Curated annotation (Swiss-Prot):
Name of the featured protein: Cell division protein FtsQ
Coiled-coil positions: none
Source organism phylogeny: Bacteria, Pseudomonadati, Pseudomonadota, Alphaproteobacteria, Hyphomicrobiales
GO biological process, one term: cell septum assembly
Cytoplasmic face of the membrane: 1-63
Amino acid sequence: MDGGGRFVFAVTGKKSTAKKREQYAATANADDRRVLPRPLRRFVRFGVSLATGRIHIPAHTGTISAVAFYAMIGLYGMSLGGHTNIVTQTTTSAAGFAVEDVKVSGNLQTSEIEVFQLLGLDGSTSLIALDIDAARRKLVQLPWVEDVDIRKVYPKTVEVRLKERQAFGIWQHGTELSLIEKSGSVIAPLRDNKFAALPLFVGRDAETGAAGFVAQLADWPEIRNRVRAYVRIAGRRWDLHLDNGIVVKLPEENLPQALQLLARLDLEEKVLSRDVAAVDLRLTDRTTIQLTEGAAERRQTAVDARTKALKKAEKNT
């Protein structure tokens, strides 16, 4: 009620209520709209700006893009056709990176010509395009090469350091002669007389047991130094062929005892200097000595003469 005795009522306002409803509906509609991710919004804005002319495209952009496109197609074609390396070789060689000097070291048995051929050096090979890993894989396939290190020394030099395998002996298998390592691995066929001083191992499995057997002879150098060939018998035991033709037949087991007996017989009886064809040490309870054919004939002649002399003596008595 105001001062004049009138009642005052609050006006609710239907228009105000309707306005609030409209604002709420607008907010709800805005929430229901799909919002693009941030990266897509950038592309959309760029497209709109490009279409409306707000972004200026520089002159010759189309030409440059076309050239780049065709260049990419050309590179892709070279890659598919395998011509990329050829182009690289030609380009870098013309720029002054052609290989002109190859320094090979560590090659006692491997010729430099073999190295050059496997590297494919023809005077126009590019140092930049030279594939070190591929070159190494080729060189380690050479029979004497155990390992190899290859370095590029710019602008025109390649350094090749070889580590070669060491020949331990000669292995005869059938009619073939091969050089072997200490491990028994075959290096290459024997083609040179310069390896004639190496020990000769004969027979199946002789190459794998060679180093271990020779090591057991270390305590008897007077015997080992006279061995011409080590012959493997049935993959179980060894025969020693000495420089004077005597064959020493060793047992499958108790090798040190047999070698000790042989050394004693030679020291006391000079058995290895006599007309002996073979010394059989395979049995532990006896040693058999086989005479040479000439010695056997002489012995038989002596026996016959002694027999006749005894018979004659009996008649006289």
